[in-house]
Amino acid sequence: MAPLSCNPPEWEDDERMSFLFSAFKRTRDVNTCDWDGKMKFWIPLILTHARAQGLLSITLSQLENDFRRKGCAPMGLRTVIQEMIRQGTLRKETDFVSGVSSGWLSWGMRQLVIRPLRWTIGTMLGSQVGPDEPLVIPEVIKERAALVLQRYQSSTFRSFPLLCEEEVHTLCAEICPNPSALNLVLLQLQGDKKICVLERAGQKLVKFVRVSVGQVEPISESDLGIYQLQQGEKLLSERLQSAGEESNRLTEEARTYNRAGNKNQALRCLRKRKLVERRITELQNKQDNIQGILERISAAETDRKVVSAYQMGVSALKQALKDVTLEKAESIVDQIQEYCDLQDDLSQTLSSVTDADVDSDDLERELNEILQNEEMIIDLPDVPSGPVIISPKRPTEWKMDQAAHSPADGSFLRSVPEPMLQ
């Protein structure tokens, strides 16, 4: 039994699980609550378990074994699976495969472990599900397909127009650990028009959709030509590595023979090394030529994209200026200037209304009066700055103080009234 990744809360409740493990009624109408309660428990649990275990397909017998509890298997799983097929959360593997073009079936069907297609009425209606019949989970397959597409677009393979079968397996090894899962994911990608498959000279080639492109384009002769060049470069690299290793080996053998005093064998090894080095030079020249062609193709592709961007920009600019002409622009500018002049005239006219009722002579006379008043204010004497009396003094004290500051003849005291001196 595969351990459940997350046991539901009811799993330890014997009474509740006894009910959930029991068989369904013959029809839902007999007991709606009983039927719906079991479905709400089992359907999410099956999907969660499959996703946690990394399963893209399941079988009835597998689920009965995985959900076995205290030696008992759930009795209603067949009914649950039939309901999931009706809802579309599960699909028979045969139905899933049959929806893809025959070009892919020639590859996928040899690797998928499925039963032969039996186009009987019962199979087409989905009324019977065998205990070992594979059932795929479309939701999980779509998630894996999206991961594979992201992996391709972020890997070094994105610069390859075509991938061979071995390269596809390398790309998807972590996401799809077995061939059956890989083919289900590739079938989904092909159904979504994210990949295109071609068989050529007994070799399967896959083309992935480019970044920011909705659907994959059919494999063209240009794609095949670039693929052949890349394969040729790869082959030359392998031969160069092998020739380099052979050259090093012959050098070591020549040194060994020379130390042993076998000069003839040492010279023979050196002659072979010369031939190998000549072959290395030829291989290197061929590889350089192929790399130069690939670089030119890449540059041409870049130029094509730039020209396409220019064309789109010109089309957008043309569309933006569709109803705009030089005459119309000049006419609009003239109208703007005309209305600006009109506004200036209106402002001047409105501001002159208040000035018409005021006599300029009166204004000038009023201004002169204001200036004269300012001059009078300026000519006033300064404010006295003598000492300030802080506290009142008695009359005698005040008299003595004034006498000290008055003239010697005492004229000031005589001018002061007598009552003030008392």
From Swiss-Prot:
It is found in: Cytoplasm; Nucleus envelope. GO terms for biological process: exit from mitosis; late endosome to vacuole transport; late endosome to vacuole transport via multivesicular body sorting pathway; nuclear membrane reassembly; protein transport; vesicle budding from membrane. Residues 234-304 form a coiled coil. InterPro entries: Snf7_fam. Its main location: cytoplasm. Belongs to the SNF7 family. This is Charged multivesicular body protein 7. It comes from Xenopus laevis (African clawed frog). The gene is chmp7.
